[in-house]
């Protein structure tokens, strides 16, 4: 089974927050919402891939992982 983990680091240095999803589509929807919140230009956020997510967010701000669990 795969678990999709999206995390967001806090700018104040406190612990990061995590969101876990069992479905890839739900994780992508969350990633899309995070991107839309950060940008005023909606036309760039129409279809989000994992590469888009990683390209748009600095690694110190957000991260995304796919975990394999049994």
Predicted feature residues:
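Short aromatic-glycine-(Arg/Gly/Cys) micro-motifs in beta-strand/loop hairpins
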Residues: 1-17, 43
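Broad hydrophobic/π-residue packing in well-ordered secondary structure
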Residues: 2-4, 21, 30, 67
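Intrinsic disorder/low-structure terminal segments
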Residues: 10, 17-20, 52, 62
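Short, flexible N-terminal segments of the mature chain
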Residues: 17-38
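Short, mixed-charge low-complexity intrinsically disordered segments
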Residues: 33-70
């Amino acid at each position: 089974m795969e678990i999709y983990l999206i995390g967001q680091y806090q700018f104040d240095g406190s612990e990061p927050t995590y969101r876990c999803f069992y479905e890839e589509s739900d994780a992508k929807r969350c990633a899309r919402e995070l991107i839309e919140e950060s940008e005023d230009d909606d036309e760039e956020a129409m279809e989000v891939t994992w590469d888009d997510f990683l390209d748009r967010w600095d690694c110190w701000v957000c991260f995304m992982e796919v975990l394999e669990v049994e």
